[in-house]
């Protein structure tokens, strides 16, 4: 089965392409690097010809509110139009747990707008909602670090991050099964408060910064409540724990 992966050269996309190949599918990595541009439409018709499934794991180059909204809306509209023309039977998109819970967050708003376009199209679809990735833990810590570099501030909101490999596996699973015409939520196996998680994580990383609990610390511009970033209903729990993932990642360097 031919499956096109939009964003197929990125962190999650490259893993998705590799896993699809392992299962014997014809996986096409589509990105500007390979001549496919979902904003201009360049290369979409050629990439989608003969495809059964299109997976979108692409990300916006800018997270500025207007830019990120324009990216996801334009990219998604162009993909859906090209899929309809090519007879693609299943659109799979990776999104975020909690898109509907942080309306003041420009990135989350843009992802929710993307989902609404997919839901309103004629293409059968599956949306995979994932929690935050282990791979981004250092960047999240840096985003709330004090100017003096000695502390990191974190709210006590619940946090249930997941390994990129497990996200890719969930996306692949959705792509080879029948369209959900709905969404599935995936999360890591461990749920902790953010402050507790980051104390453990920074210690494991050998990062000496102190983690200070602050309920008003903003997560990329948004103040969180307890359940902003975690599944509140049924979810598929991944297997890889952060400590195990970090050990493998460190050993692989």
Regions found by a protein language model. Name each.
Residues 12, 54, 167-171, 186, ...:
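Non-catalytic, hydrophobic alpha-helical segments
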Residues 22-86, 97-106:
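NAD(P)H-binding glycine-rich loop region in Rossmannoid oxidoreductase-like domains
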Residues 87-90, 95, 113-136:
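Conserved beta-loop-beta element that borders a ligand/cofactor-binding pocket
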Residues 125-127, 139-162, 166:
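A conserved pocket-lining segment of Rossmann-fold NAD(P)-dependent short-chain dehydrogenase/reductase
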Residues 135-142, 146-148, 174-184, 207-209:
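Glycine/proline-rich active-site loop of Rossmann-fold NAD(P)-dependent oxidoreductases
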Residues 191, 198-253:
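Mobile cap/lid helix-loop segments that border enzyme active or cofactor-binding sites
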């Amino acid at each position: 089965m031919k499956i096109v992966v939009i964003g197929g050269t990125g962190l999650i996309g490259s893993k998705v392409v590799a896993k699809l190949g392992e299962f014997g599918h014809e996986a096409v990595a589509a990105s500007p690097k390979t001549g496919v541009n979902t904003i201009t439409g360049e290369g979409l018709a050629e990439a989608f010809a003969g495809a059964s499934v299109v997976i979108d794991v692409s990300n916006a180059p800018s997270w500025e509110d207007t830019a990120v909204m324009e990216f996801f809306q334009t990219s998604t509209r162009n993909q859906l139009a090209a899929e309809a023309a090519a007879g693609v039977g299943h659109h799979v998109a990776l999104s975020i747990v909690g898109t509907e819970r942080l309306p003041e967050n420009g990135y989350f708003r843009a992802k929710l707008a993307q989902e609404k376009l997919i839901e309103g199209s004629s293409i059968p679809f599956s949306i995979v909602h994932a929690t935050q990735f282990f791979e981004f833990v250092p960047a999240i810590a840096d985003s709330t670090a004090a100017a003096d570099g000695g502390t990191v501030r974190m709210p006590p909101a619940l946090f249930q991050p997941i390994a990129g490999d497990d996200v890719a596996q969930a996306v692949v699973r959705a792509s080879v099964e029948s369209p959900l015409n709905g969404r599935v939520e995936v999360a890591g196996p461990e749920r902790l408060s953010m402050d507790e998680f980051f104390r453990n994580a920074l210690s494991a990383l050998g990062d000496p910064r102190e983690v200070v609990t602050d309920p008003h610390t903003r997560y990329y511009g948004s103040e969180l409540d307890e359940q902003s970033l975690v599944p509140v209903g049924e979810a598929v729990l991944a297997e890889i724990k952060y400590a195990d993932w970090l050990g493998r990642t460190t050993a692989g360097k």
